C-alpha cells in the first residue's frame, strides 16, 4: 500500500513523495537450487569483435546484465557502444540506443561519419523532457535484447528537473527500472542487457553515485591512447 506524503520547501511547489507500507509477508528468501530462469540467459550475444573476449568468459555480451562503460570526454565511449549495437543488430538482435546528449541532427552527422550506425534504432530523450519516466518505462516495456543509455548523468538530471526530486530518488528509479526489465519484466519477456555510458572526472574518478557502481554487474573503462586513434578497454569489475 502506498501513502502520499507532501513535502514543501520555501519558494517551491510541494513535492509528492510516495512511501510504501511494509508487508512482512512479501519477504522471500531463496536457495540457489530454488531459482529458475530460461536457459537463454546463459547464451552470450556475440558482436564478432575483440570486445567479445572481455565482455564475458563465454565470449560475448551475456543477457540480463547491466554494465557501465565510463571514460573521459572524447575517449570514444559512444562510438564503441554504437559499434557493438550495430554488430548485434546485424545478427538479428533487437537493440535500442537512448540518446540523452545528441538530438536528431547531431546523430545524423554522427551516422554520416560512421555509416554502420544507421541500423541502430534511437530514442532521442531530449524530445521527452517532460515525460522522461513515462517515456522510458513505456519504451523499455516493448522488449529489447540490449539497451544502451548515453548517458546516466543526463537521464538522472532530466528526471530530477522534471519531477523535482533528489538525485538518490532518481538513481533508485533508474536502477529499479533496469532491474525489472532485465529480469524479463517486459512484453516480450526478454532478459534485457543494459549498457550505461558515464563520464569520469578530470582526476579520472567515476562521476556519479557510488550506488550505481555497486549495483551494476560490470564496470568497463575506456582510455584513448595518446598520440593515436586506438583505445584501451578494460574491466575493473565483471561478474560474467
Show where each model-derived region lies.
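Short beta->alpha connector loops
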Residues: 75, 129-131, 200-203
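Short, flexible loop motifs at catalytic/binding sites
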Residues: 23-27, 32-34, 141-143, 154, ...
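Phosphate-binding/switch region of NTP-binding enzymes
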Residues: 178-240
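A short acidic, amphipathic alpha-helical/loop segment
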Residues: 80-84, 135-137, 176, 208-211
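Conserved inter-motif catalytic segment of the P-loop NTP-binding fold
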Residues: 72, 91-176, 180
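The Walker A/P-loop phosphate-binding site
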Residues: 2-114
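Short, glycine/acidic-rich beta->alpha junctions
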Residues: 77, 169, 203-205
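Conserved catalytic network of the ASCE P-loop NTPase/AAA+ motor domain
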Residues: 60-61, 87-91, 115-116, 138-142, ...
